[in-house]
A protein has these predicted regions:
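Substrate-binding/active-site clefts of carbohydrate-active enzymes
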Residues: 1-107, 111, 133, 137, ...
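Active-site rim elements
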Residues: 88-94, 118-121, 227-228
Length: 228
């Protein structure tokens, strides 16, 4: 959209944006009133113009205005605050943006027994943050299994797969720092364009590399980001 067309439905200069997430929580390239602009690095930019949570911040924050209003109107503000306080106290964590998000995401694991996350555009979050999310998601899955004996017949650990554009069959910091169990393999589709005759050699390379490096990849032949 042109700036003129965007402004026709998004009034960026309004002071009402202070009642949304607030500048302690997010940055935005839409020049929203009172909000910081995105940076230039992968982890600080506003991807595709979307608001970006400040997961790198070490500052403690209170609940954002929109959640305070929403939960108060639903009559569950005290309950939500108590659950958050219990999570932070039990795990001895500061009330940072990252740790709030870890709490909310792992609630899905603790409540429904979700046993893995597929993490989109992983390069836009510091890899240490992904490792922290996996740590607490793993604990939440253990909690769910203890509370729901017999509901599953497998005890595999919580699993994460990351998507980082153009990642191939290689061991790097996504595995070692981000603690991903697998990364999406963009190279498979590219190699396949050379013809099906390459498959035996390609499979051998992938198998040998994954075995040697003790890694796993998730390969695909087509996606909404690419073409076959």
């Amino acid at each position: 959209l042109s700036p003129e067309a965007e402004e026709s439905y998004l009034v960026t200069a309004s002071d009402s944006w202070s009642g949304w997430w607030g500048s302690d929580w997010i940055r935005s390239d839409d020049a929203l009133s009172g909000y910081d602009r995105g940076g230039t690095s992968d982890t600080l930019m506003s991807l595709s113009g979307l608001p970006d949570f400040k997961t790198e911040s070490t500052e403690e924050v209170g609940l954002p205005p929109l959640l305070l209003e929403k939960w108060a109107s639903e009559g569950r503000l005290e309950q939500e605050q108590n659950e958050l306080d219990a999570f932070f106290e039990e795990n001895k964590l500061p009330k940072t943006v990252l740790n709030y998000e870890i709490k909310w995401l792992t609630d899905w694991v603790a409540e429904y027994g979700i046993d893995g996350f597929r993490c989109d555009t992983a390069k836009h979050i510091d890899q240490k943050c992904w490792a922290e999310l996996k740590k607490y998601a793993s604990l939440a899955l253990e909690e769910w299994r203890k509370a729901n004996p017999g509901k599953t017949d497998f005890e595999t650990p919580f699993w994460t797969v990351g998507e980082a554009w153009d990642h191939g069959v290689v061991k790097d910091t996504y595995f070692e720092t981000g603690m991903f169990d697998a990364m999406i393999n963009f190279s498979f589709r590219k190699n396949l364009l050379k013809g099906y005759s390459i498959l035996p050699k390609l499979y051998t390379f992938m198998s040998d590399t994954m075995r040697k490096e003790d890694i796993s990849v998730l390969s695909y032949i087509s996606s909404h980001d690419t073409a076959l």
